[in-house]
């Protein structure tokens, strides 16, 4: 299953790290975040380094998107997921 993560603060990082450890069942294709460089720096120790994607790209390429972004971003995220018929799991406020 191809998983995309939106938001890469403390929650997004922990979600990505756990999925990376369970990589036989799941595959994180990448992350969308306001801070692109943070993704590269924080995932250098992962089994598979993560790629940065735009919001459109991550919703289009993922089977499931996990929303770890601040609640203010939810409306835009859910609209993109609806546009691309992508399943959405939200773990943020």
PLM segments and residue spans:
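Aromatic pocket-lining residues of Rossmann-like dinucleotide-binding sites
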Residues: 19
């Amino acid at each position: 299953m191809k998983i995309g993560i939106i938001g890469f603060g403390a929650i997004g990082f922990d979600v990505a790290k756990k999925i990376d450890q369970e990589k036989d069942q799941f595959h994180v294709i990448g992350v969308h975040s306001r801070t692109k460089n943070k993704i590269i720096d924080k995932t250098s120790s992962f089994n598979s380094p993560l790629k940065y994607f735009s919001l459109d790209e991550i919703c289009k390429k993922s089977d499931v998107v996990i929303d770890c972004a601040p609640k203010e971003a939810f409306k835009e995220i859910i609209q993109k997921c609806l546009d691309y018929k992508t399943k959405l799991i939200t773990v943020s406020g």
